[in-house]
Amino acid sequence: LILVERLIPFQETSEGFFDMFDVVIQLGAILAVVVLFWNKIWPFYLKKNKQPKKGGIVKSAKDPAVGNVALSMDAFWMWVKIVVACIPAVVYGLLFDDAVSEAFKKEIGGSGVTIQVIVVAVMLVLVGVLFIVIENWNKNRVPTTTKLSQLTYRDALIIGLCQLVAAALPGTSRSGATILGAIMIGISRTVAAEFTFFLAIPVMFGASLLKVLKFGFAFTGMELACLLVGTVISFIVSLFVLRFLMGYIKKHDFKV
């Protein structure tokens, strides 16, 4: 998005709008995650429904319940681990995000090219190369974690630190960084991808809220239209991409 905006700059928008836009439209992708993985992320269920839907949350007779509504402890502890993984990004966002963002906006020697653009270009290539290198290194290893329930708090924190790299360096894929980190510590591709997508739910909602608050809700009609269209397109595209990706990585690696 940062590189595209350099080629096709937004017209008739307020200062700082694009910084907010490229974060907020990702809510469309997060909504796609919620829709596709609802059976795995929603921890409550009706006790009368004894058989879980295929690929849904794990149900147990020991799960606490109020009346006919029970709480899947398996799903509950998954969300606790997601909170642990969010801690590095939350600390960074509150303390350093503004300062780092301003530093990356500085031009290089009056050339009109910002540090941000250079970092984005470098990180796009570097992350792609890392996927190839790490997949080659990982090809003969057997994953030690093949279920979400097997993730430890240590695993969650390491994945959260990988996410921090993506938050600090523009152009670094958040999903790419966390999936690579997860694979390196012995987590299967499917579990790595699922946990990464679930982790994005609170992170991107929080990041979007923070950006909108800083922008001040002072949208023009054009800006509001851009946000709505961008978010809807993000949602539709993500539905297809996520379905394809989850099916693809069950049989293939990320080297393509």
PLM region spans:
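Multi-pass membrane proteins that catalyze or facilitate reactions on polyprenyl-/lipid-phosphate substrates
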Residues: 1-256
